[in-house]
Regions:
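Cysteine/selenocysteine-centered motifs that mediate thiol-based redox chemistry or coordinate metal-sulfur cofactors
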Residues: 95-147
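A sequence-level detector of short, solvent-exposed, charge-rich linear segments
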Residues: 20-27, 42, 50, 89, ...
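A short, polar/charged loop-to-alpha-helix boundary motif
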Residues: 79-96
Length: 147
């Protein structure tokens, strides 16, 4: 929108789309994509981390290159912050760093189950990592839902 406005006002500005982002909500279903997450990928060049909540209505996938730098994320059934993943992808964070800080990406953490705790445990089990899984905040302990 901003680029279009500049160009309509005769101030030529190049279009720089930035990191791909898409978010959709249909009734109570949340779905978000950050960065590049194709439906298929070359397993020799791309590492995949996938976590699914046991009832099957919430999941998280992160793709990384062979250096374990984040390429993109899909999440289904819970909300995460766009700004967090925009920064992580732009700055080429490692998958470990993304997962270690995943509590910072949690949207409305006081009111939703802290899925990031289970995601962090699953990532450590699959890829290892030198981080401690986050803990619930005082507000989450007091009012929040559980996983």
């Amino acid at each position: 929108g901003e680029t279009l406005a500049h160009n309509l006002c005769k101030k030529t500005v190049p279009y720089e789309p930035g990191i791909w982002f898409n978010s959709a909500k249909f009734f109570d279903i949340e779905y978000q994509t950050y960065g590049t997450v194709p439906s298929t990928w070359d397993e020799a060049e791309t590492k995949s981390f996938y976590w699914e909540h046991s009832p099957g209505k919430v999941c998280f996938r992160m793709l990384m290159n062979t250096n374990h730098q984040i390429l993109g994320v899909n999440n289904f059934g819970f909300r995460l912050r766009h700004e967090f993943f925009d920064q992580a992808i732009r700055e080429k964070w490692s998958g470990e760093k993304v997962i270690a800080k995943l509590d910072k990406a949690n949207f409305d953490p006081e009111f939703f189950a802290p899925y990031y705790l289970e995601i962090q445990k699953a990532f450590k089990a699959q890829f290892g990592g030198n981080f401690q899984p986050a803990k619930k905040s005082f507000i989450q302990k007091l009012f929040g839902a559980s996983v």
